[in-house]
Amino acid sequence: MVKVMVVAEVRPSEDVNKVLSAISNFFDFEKTNTRKEGIIDILVLEARTLKSLLKFHRVLRNERILDSARKYLMKGIEGNTIAFMIHKQAAAVGVLSFVDSDKESPLGAIKFYIEYQNPKEVVDWLAPRTAHGVPLWDNPIPPDV
């Protein structure tokens, strides 16, 4: 079973449509939920297929950041889940920038959670090892089981 979930705060100074647009640069979601936490809206976007990450897959190659992406993705594996964060303001202009902490993105980071039976298989598809910036392999997208 596959579940991809993206969570982002929408602060009072932000436009929810701009945050959705920033996320859409990297992720095609099937379902959207919003909940309120005080004055902050929390967007929760979900998909049940790894195909929802095809834009993310393409951007990693276009920006030539496979090595750093692999590091962040591998570091984020816990059990059958991969968790990582990206900079919200960079995402708003279509640039993918990983962050280690929510504090590195002044308006809050965009948080990704990918649940898959074998998370390393997903990492190998999204961000394979490289030699001199060239991927050592190009795995097909893992099946949505």
UniProtKB/Swiss-Prot annotation:
<dbReference type="Pfam" id="PF01877">
    <property type="entry name" value="RNA_binding"/>
</dbReference>
<comment type="similarity">
    <text>Belongs to the UPF0201 family.</text>
</comment>
<dbReference type="InterPro" id="IPR022803">
    <property type="entry name" value="Ribosomal_uL5_dom_sf"/>
</dbReference>
<protein>
    <recommendedName>
        <fullName>UPF0201 protein LS215_1276</fullName>
    </recommendedName>
</protein>
<dbReference type="InterPro" id="IPR002739">
    <property type="entry name" value="PAB1135-like"/>
</dbReference>
